[in-house]
Amino acid sequence: GGPLKTLNVSHSFVAEGAQAAGASQQIVVEALAEEIQKAGGRIFYNTTAVQLDREGDNTGRVTGCVAKHDGEYTRYKATKGVVLATGGYGKDVAFRSAQDPRLDETVGCTNFEGATAHGLKVALDAGVMGMQLDQIQCYPYTSPEEDSFGCAATWIEAESAYAPTIDPTTGKRFVNELTDRKRFCDAMFEVGTPLLQIGSVDNVPDWCAESLENALAAGVTREFSSLEEIASEFDVPLDGLKAQMDSYNACVTAGEDTEFGKLFNPDAKPVVTAPYYVTRAWPKVHHCMGGVKTDIDCRVIGNDLEPIVGLYGAGEAT
């Protein structure tokens, strides 16, 4: 058969005990590569598919692909089939912003540099049906102060259970900080500027203390001794900020968020004791739900709504 590439996808869920063995998708990729080679398969690295070959003037069975390596093109024949496992297109600013204009160059991405739409466009050129390409998930817990996923994201997400996130132009909250990722990001984009998460020393449970330490060490999360310092540093209206913090803390004390319906953790305390921990937050593209259309057997569907013989899709490419 033809070559099989194993490429990164957005993320994987790995049991906590497995993290030390090779966190997230890396351990999966390495294990698959090892099994392929044990079975006598070959992996062609730095080899980019540029065309899918189909019988019948690009309407029939997929018979292989043309790929480029070191400036040279090679045709690979597939006797059983071709699997599209090219991942998402989160790093492809031109393509993603064509689907969702909000996701321009001002929005970062948690993915690796190879997460482009190249493989998807090769498939579309071969008559594959693209499905819901504008359904691109953003991650609301990242900071514009660092590249990619960064080290502060785990702290921002953990502290969202305890801390308010405010609009620096008003000093006010704008969303339930524990809402789903889409609603959170949509609300952030509506504000239109990076937001401020304001946590405090009384709201650092043991299970996320290491995340805070990492964010502080990187300079992404910063310590402040008062609301006045925060307002001065980030040009936040002080009166609005104080009123919001008083209102939020009253909700925490009462155990009911009358502003946005947030469910407080049982160990949540009012955000009143310095040091305050402030982190700028802004969404980053995280996962592409759209991709090539497949059926229940992973067969890729063509523009005629019929399965394309010899072509399969897997992972974030679908």
For the regions a protein language model found, what residue spans apply to each?
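A glycine-rich dinucleotide-binding beta-alpha-beta segment and adjacent secondary-structure elements
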Residues: 51, 240-318
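Hydrophobic "anchor" residues
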Residues: 62, 173, 300-301
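Conserved redox-cofactor binding core of oxidoreductases
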Residues: 1-73, 93-94, 143-144, 252-273
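Glycine-rich loop(s) and the adjacent beta-strand/alpha-helix scaffold that form part
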Residues: 69-143
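Short, acidic, Ser/Thr-enriched surface-loop or helix-capping motifs
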Residues: 57, 68, 167-168, 295-296, ...
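Short Gly/Pro-enriched turn/cap motifs at secondary-structure boundaries
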Residues: 12-19, 44, 110-112, 152-157, ...
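An anion/pyrophosphate-binding glycine-rich loop and adjacent beta-alpha core
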Residues: 116, 120-236, 240
